[in-house]
Amino acid sequence: MTSPALKDPAKTRVIVGMSGGVDSSVSALLLMEQGYQVEGLFMKNWEEDDGTEYCTAREDLADAQAVCDRIGIKLHTANFAAEYWDNVFEHFLEEYKAGRTPNPDILCNREIKFKAFLDYALSLGADLIATGHYVRRRDTGAVTELLKGLDPNKDQSYFLHAVGGKEIARTLFPVGELEKPEVRAIAEKHGLATAKKKDSTGICFIGERRFSDFLKQYLPAQPGEIQTTEGEVIGRHHGLMYHTIGQRQGLGIGGLKDAGDEPWYVLHKDLTRNVLVVGQGNEHPWLFSRALLASEIFWVNPIDLSSPRTLTAKVRYRQSDQRCTLALTESGYRAVFDEPQRAVTPGQSVVFYDGEVCLGGGVIETAEPWSPRA
């Protein structure tokens, strides 16, 4: 089967997901220059905070419209707030209730940007969609692979690992072959309103507010004890959901007699007892894992795991590739690392690579300690 991307650009209608940022703006411009029939689409995925200081949707829509007006393309708008609530946000809350630390951006990409948006674009008569993600695609016969973005500082394949090959085959990634400074320079050269706009950071629906303030609107806090690894009570937490493995800030521990000056870190969340276990030192042994179990694995394309495979993996965004051996066991997918991994966090994602190819990944269920715990 020939990939849709291999058609004549002049006969190919592409709808670009316009976020109001510089990356999607330049993506639309580049596709225009390549001869595609280009239109834009602005997605509204969150409605809870309309009219508040935290919601930037109006500003983002205005920026997207300004860019579309500048380059002379039509801008569609679509409201996917209901789909986002049902397929992303409710899962986000359930994970926090379970004491885990989820990554909603990964689910948003799979369920909204490469499902709801793709379906909507196809219903408008599009042949392909495009986004401003820093990833690349490679077509090999009937198979479309997801590759890391050329800019190692901006590569976003970690966040797109749960998107299937069929969806990738329907998508163009114009800035994936560029580095960020090049993208801004192109936007500046063409007078795009988003040329100097700051990149968005953090979880989209939280904005600039404190995470704990946001979360307590939806989940009741359950305060409990903070204990050392020896079981000594040294403080109280406001709720396990506010903390993640490896966290240093916001523990409220200080001035303890004979404790020394080394900072305290979250080592473990004991969900059964509602206890936050902490220890001192960035290199505390409890922070390191030798292996992990993952579930809910999504492969971009099916892979053969009839025998263990040596791959590389990331257990967090921006982490360098870590060599591991992946095997399918009765308990799930088990990755054993060559080197100890710090702060492996249940609920976060582990993403597997073969060189520059992103194979897929899944949710971390448990981490196995690097050294035995008493």
From Swiss-Prot:
ATP binds at G17, M18, S19, G20, G21, V22, D23, S24, M43, G132. Its EC number is 2.8.1.13. One of its GO terms (molecular function) is tRNA binding. It comes from the Bacteria. Disulfide bonds join C108-C204. It is found in: Cytoplasm. Residues 103-105 are annotated as: Interaction with target base in tRNA. Keywords: ATP-binding, Cytoplasm, Disulfide bond, Nucleotide-binding, RNA-binding, Transferase, tRNA processing, tRNA-binding. It catalyses: S-sulfanyl-L-cysteinyl-[protein] + uridine(34) in tRNA + AH2 + ATP = 2-thiouridine(34) in tRNA + L-cysteinyl-[protein] + A + AMP + diphosphate + H(+). Its main location: cytoplasm. The keyword Hydrolase does not apply. The active site is at C108, C204. CDD domains: MnmA_TRMU-like. The keyword RNA-binding applies. The record marks H133, Q348 as: Interaction with tRNA. GO terms for biological process: tRNA wobble position uridine thiolation. Belongs to the MnmA/TRMU family. This is tRNA-specific 2-thiouridylase MnmA. It comes from Pseudomonas putida (strain W619).
